[in-house]
Amino acid sequence: PTKLKSDAVDYECELAVVIGRTAKHVKKENAYDYVGGYTVANDYAIRDYLENWYRPNFRVKNRDTCTPIGPWLVDAKDIHDIYGSPMNLSLQTTVNGKITQSGHTRDMIFDVPTLIEYFSAFMTLQPGDLILTGTPDGVVNCEVGKVIVTSIEGIGDLINTLGE
């Protein structure tokens, strides 16, 4: 189980982009050439550690067990061959079998090429680096013992049970 000490833990189903080769100053039109694959990320947020607008929320996201990924890595070519783009995938979260999030990658604020262009402009992306792409509406507080399943079409189901 994912173990977190908090009264306010939210889940976030996100497409995780896995960088496949070193990327620096990449243009959007070439961005997919740098993707090795895709996986599911559950980017838990511990909301009782939220500070304020003027301080980074480092403690909200950066905790042991807070960002499980999986269930496996799907090769970028497979996603592009079958779906045309990672921007054509449905996302869903269930909590104890009840659908709580349902969305689509085409509705993301920034598409994958935009994110790669942006980040590679000021940092070198290395093979294995992850870019998490954002979550659809429907995030709710989780409780100990709840089973959270974050799913992305063409990738799979990531299953976590929230522990203390």
Model-derived features: where do they sit?
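Short coil/turn connectors at secondary-structure junctions
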Residues: K5-S6, Y11-E14, D33-G36, L89, ...
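RNA pseudouridine synthases
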Residues: E12-C13, I19-R21, H25-N42
